[in-house]
Amino acid sequence: MKKIIETQRAPGAIGPYVQGVDLGSMVFTSGQIPVCPQTGEIPADVQDQARLSLENVKAIVVAAGLSVGDIIKMTVFITDLNDFATINEVYKQFFDEHQATYPTRSCVQVARLPKDVKLEIEAIAVRSA
């Protein structure tokens, strides 16, 4: 059975979609841009944007009763491949801090993202039986 995930710890949807969907064994997040859920502010720096997007993904996964370690796949959309190394540093630090194995990942450059942010991240997490 499908359950919609909603949390105040991640920014609300800016279109006709939900933050996440829990299918029981799997959780899918919508793409998370670096919007602070409390203030609506967007950091200017790509490092801060990457960290905030990861924290927003984490908030949705946690709202579903899972943890960072349950994430098995991430897709990262970036507007400038020159930011790839910087984003990788933040990404590595985030997963290391949570003592989680790195999930599979795709990273693609796109022309533009909502609110002209530098990146967007979505995830798939799996609930162990």
Swiss-Prot record:
Q: Which domain of life does the UniProt lineage start with? A: Bacteria
Gene Ontology molecular function: deaminase activity; identical protein binding
Pathway(s) served: Amino-acid degradation; L-threonine degradation via propanoate pathway
User: Which GO BP terms apply?
Assistant: L-threonine catabolic process to propionate; threonine metabolic process
Report the CDD domains cross-referenced here. YjgF_YER057c_UK114_family (cd00448)
Q: What class of enzyme is it?
A: hydrolase
Its EC number(s) = 3.5.4.-
Q: Which UniProt keywords apply?
A: Hydrolase, Pyridoxal phosphate
Q: Which family does it belong to?
A: Belongs to the RutC family.
Q: Quaternary form?
A: Homotrimer.
Described by its record, this protein's role is as follows: May be a post-translational regulator that controls the metabolic fate of L-threonine or the potentially toxic intermediate 2-ketobutyrate.
Quote the NCBIfam families the UniProt record gives. PRK11401.1, Rid family detoxifying hydrolase
Q: Any idea what this protein is called? A: Putative reactive intermediate deaminase TdcF
Q: Organism source for this protein?
A: Escherichia coli (strain K12)
